[in-house]
Amino acid sequence: MAQKTETAIPSNSKARFETLYREKVTKALSERFGYKNVMNIPRLQKISINIGVGEAASEPKLLETAIQELAQITGQKPQIRKSKKAISNFKLREGQAIGCRVTLRRKAMYEFFDRFVSLAVPRIRDFRGLSDTSFDGRGNYTIGVREQIIFPEIDIDKIPKICGMDISFVTSAKTDEEAYVLLAELGMPFKKKN
């Protein structure tokens, strides 16, 4: 009987985009903006992924599938988000579960960023580049994804309903221009400026 051999990945190994950031992006940013101190160079701090399931009030099963899908995509257990106040028009009670969220940091963040840029974004229908107008003025970038099926971890045959998500890239950049250059250097496929 043949023995299984597993190749273990060292726990101290860096993610591909983390290595890219340390070796190339920091140099490009310091040359462009003239940073004197390494600690002033903007970095990606966290990625927050949020799925809002408004129909969870009438169909609680949809929230369960959204939680499972978000766990598959990120490799981390999602936090359930509850409504803060009751809204009768939406048949929503205070404290009712209406969504889920995951916050990724460090290695998991860079691995998700790698999968997002390399695998998921090219699978977006009619993709012509990400808009550069979604910066918030403080160096953070948020994108709305309409379909969770762009991620290869999701099996299209097993999902009951296509739902979207909001992905926020939080950086330590002070301005939107710094954040734009940081994300573009990391490989974020923005629309070409004329």
UniProtKB/Swiss-Prot annotation:
Q: Could you tell me one molecular function GO term of this UniProt entry?
A: tRNA binding
> Record keywords: tRNA-binding included?
yes
Please give the superkingdom of this protein's source. Answer: Bacteria
Which GO terms fall under biological process for this protein? translation
**UniProt keyword annotations, A-Z:** Ribonucleoprotein, Ribosomal protein, RNA-binding, rRNA-binding, tRNA-binding
Q: Which GO terms describe its cellular component?
A: ribonucleoprotein complex; ribosome
This protein's assembly is summarised as: Part of the 50S ribosomal subunit; part of the 5S rRNA/L5/L18/L25 subcomplex. Contacts the 5S rRNA and the P site tRNA. Forms a bridge to the 30S subunit in the 70S ribosome.
Matching HAMAP family: Ribosomal_uL5_B (MF_01333_B)
The entry's protein name is Large ribosomal subunit protein uL5
